[in-house]
Amino acid sequence: GLVGSERCIRDRCDVGGFSSRPGAAEVTPEEEWRRVEAGVAAVRRIAPTLPVSVDTFRAEVARRVLETFGPVIVNDISAGEMDPAIVDVVAEYDVPYIAMHMRGTPATMQGMTSYRDVVEEVVSYFRLRAEQLRRCGVRRLIFDPGFGFAKTLEQNYDLLRGLHNLCSLGYPVLAGVSRKSMIYKVLDTTPDRALAGTIALGWECLRQGAAILRVHDVQEAVDTVRIFKAFRP
């Protein structure tokens, strides 16, 4: 789920049909669409008014979702780099677009972690990418720094410490740290036992200015946001 921190607590459901984990099996566009269609349809049956984001980098899948279900948030792990045509689809339908920072592809990204300064390079990337996307007609931008995508453990924490620099660009920032390896490797545990670390890093993301948290444990995240809002009204 996606839990927002701006003004009020807003829940969204993120639906994807393509795993971005390193080593995950390749999925054809048709199979991805089949999975996404089933997922979005299920959400719409259960909660017709709940905002939905669709996790895809493929223009074809994004277009079919928008044609079938109407407006959704498009959540693209490649910020339009893997399938540039997705940018035109987003602009045509004028829907919110989550652009994530990643080098390479999910299959190659872990070998592309050489940065002079990870914070500076991610911020510079989004500063330039924002101009490019806006020129293409994308108006409703959300940035995701891509924790765990083409970053080492140390770089993830460097990026978290400097997250306020990305937030200062003036666009909403989505932070996805839930159950990530940057938590469970430090704690020497497993993803399903990383809730306490997830809450701790989620709080820090909020403190740095993140507008949205991408989470697995929705109620715990909502509680974290509510306490944060009480602490910093």
Which residue stretches match the model-derived regions?
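Active-site-adjacent loop and "lid" segments of alpha/beta metabolic enzymes
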Residues: 20-46, 50-53, 57-59, 66-69, ...
